[in-house]
Amino acid sequence: VSDMHSILERVDGVLFTGGPDLHPGLYGEDVMDCCGEIAEERDALEIPLMQEAIRMNKPVLAVCRGFQIMNVALGGSLYQDIGKQHKSSVQISHSQEEKDAVHPAHKVNVIRDTPLHQSARVCCKSE
């Protein structure tokens, strides 16, 4: 964590991106058959990184898996497969086909005058 602290002191914020499922053991469950691909090494890095970023009050942008990291890092739990474990009349599927990994998976609307909007303006030189 001390290395993470020194790294986080040098950055303005942290982006937690999408990716594989978190290991269910992180939120007190055994792996079920419906659980997707797991990235334990990434979990081991991102959970303490999220906790330290929050502790240091660093801005965090979480996308897809990033929201799951935030939730679990703060003590929350997850469905291993929400479509199979939570019955709903609405189809819930948050995955992207490997063959389509170059196209956006999610539409993003950035609200004007938010920190993300300011960052996007600096990064992309547009409003």
Residue spans of the language-model regions?
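Flexible gly/pro-rich beta->alpha loop and the following alpha-helix that scaffold active-site loops
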Residues: 1-61, 74-75, 79, 83-88
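Conserved G/P- and acidic residue-centered "switch" motifs that form tight phosphate/ATP-binding loops
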Residues: 64
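Hydrophobic, aromatic-enriched interface-forming segments
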Residues: 67-72
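Pocket-forming structural segment of enzyme catalytic cores
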Residues: 74-127
